[in-house]
Structure formats: C-alpha cells, structure tokens
C-alpha cells in the first residue's frame, strides 16, 4: 500500500489513505460535528486564522478544518492519483 499525501493549504499535509470525506462547513450537521470534535479534543484547525472553507473527515474520527475549498483539495487528490497511476502503468 502506497502512502499518498495531500496538501490542504499553508504547508499542511494529510494522508489520503485515511481520508473519508471532504465537505463544506456551511450545513448545521457539519457545524455540530465540528463542535463535537472540538469538545472531544479531536479537532485540528489548519486554517491559520482564515475562514474555514473545507472540513476534512478522517477515519480516526479526527476533523480537520482547512482554508482551501473542498473542490481544490479533491482536485489535488485526483491529480496525485493520476500521477501514481501513470507511474505504475
């Protein structure tokens, strides 16, 4: 199994293998998830004080806040997978 890393902004990198979902922080259920993670000590704020634009949900129950749009993070993941596929094929 190859370890894939994704840049989520400002030099912060996460493991793509542990990623479950990338969502927008606007909905009430996501806001509740963020608050719950904060209360449990499972919230990682990688926004550097900027507005939260993406919420990354990891398989370890960690919630990561990013200042990068969800589409941008998803595109970085797609590009990374294409590069990996070309290298193998």
UniProtKB/Swiss-Prot annotation:
In Pfam terms, one family for this protein is RemA-like
Q: Which domain of life is it from?
A: Bacteria
Entry-linked PANTHER family: REGULATORY PROTEIN SSL2874-RELATED, REGULATORY PROTEIN TM_1690-RELATED
| NCBIfam families attached to this UniProt entry | MtxBflmRegRemA, PRK04323.1
Annotated family = Belongs to the RemA family.
Which protein are we looking at? Putative regulatory protein BLi01788/BL02292
């Amino acid at each position: 199994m190859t370890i894939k890393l994704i840049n989520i902004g400002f030099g912060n990198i996460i493991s793509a293998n542990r990623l479950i979902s990338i969502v927008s922080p606007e909905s009430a259920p996501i806001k509740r998830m963020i608050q719950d993670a904060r209360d449990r000590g499972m919230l990682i704020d990688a926004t550097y004080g900027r507005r939260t634009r993406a919420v990354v949900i990891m398989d370890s129950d960690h919630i990561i806040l990013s200042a990068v749009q969800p589409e941008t993070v998803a595109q970085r993941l797609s590009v990374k997978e294409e590069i990996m596929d070309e290298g193998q094929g």
